[in-house]
Amino acid sequence: GVGLGNDPMNVDELKFVYENSQIALPSMATNFQYHSPLLLKTNINFIMVVHGEQRLSVTNPLPVSGDFITNAKVIGCYDKGPGKGAIIEVETTVNLKKDNTEICKLVSTTFARGDGGFGGPESPKKELVRPEGKPDYVHEINTKPDQALIFRLSGDYNPLHSDPNFAKSAGFERPILHGMCTYGIACRSIIESVCDKDVKKLKRFDCRFSSPVYPGETIVTEMWKDGNNVYYQCKVKERDKMVIKNG
């Protein structure tokens, strides 16, 4: 779904897709969020919903298989004002069922563009200040025109990413790439560039989605290393448009 295995001769990519040596990309843990019924119980306008931010804190490496227990709760609901939308934060904890080992915690921020003006508190501003100067690493990954149709098989069947008419009704010229696909591509870029291709070195992975990616575009991840921390941002090469910031 994020392009791993495009080169069948690249053994570093094969380990993510070949069952005899398979490991999981940490960002795959975000799949556990798709099954939360919390937002389905609200009256928000789902046509106008997009992914706003994503945070991942890794406690233990994600197994490639197993039974898991997830617990989700709403931890924040913020009002951007009439006509400006609302922000909803949901925290999901993921544990192994067999021994209750914690795997990770996820915080997903939903931007409900059509549901502002309900009188809630304003969203707190959280801006990261990255190191100055040119990035220490730059990594490019080309997406395919059918990338969203492949990625949706991970469990996110929102028609915004597959149905041209639905996408237009939501204000986009055509179906957009899942934010979680862009997130996974950024995760892959950092692991390949900074983590010596070792998934166990990634302990936290956060971002803010600032603009959509269209399938077929090239995602450029720029990274600044500061000790054990890596600051990053992503942009689309063809449009020179920032699509992820606060990474």
Placement of each model-derived feature along the sequence:
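Acidic/His-leaning functional-site neighborhoods
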Residues: 144-220, 224-231, 240
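Short amphipathic alpha-helical surface micro-motifs
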Residues: 12-14, 32-40, 53, 70-74, ...
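HotDog/MaoC-like acyl-thioester-processing domains
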Residues: 49-139, 209, 213-216, 220-247
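Hydrophobic, proline/glycine-rich low-complexity stretches
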Residues: 1-67, 194
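Residue-level recognition of well-ordered secondary-structure positions
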Residues: 1, 21, 29-30, 73, ...
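Catalytic strand-loop segment that frames the active site of acyl-thioester-processing enzymes
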Residues: 1-23, 98, 110-177, 191
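Long, contiguous hydrophobic alpha-helical segments, chiefly transmembrane helices and signal peptides
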Residues: 25-31, 49-52, 56, 111-112, ...
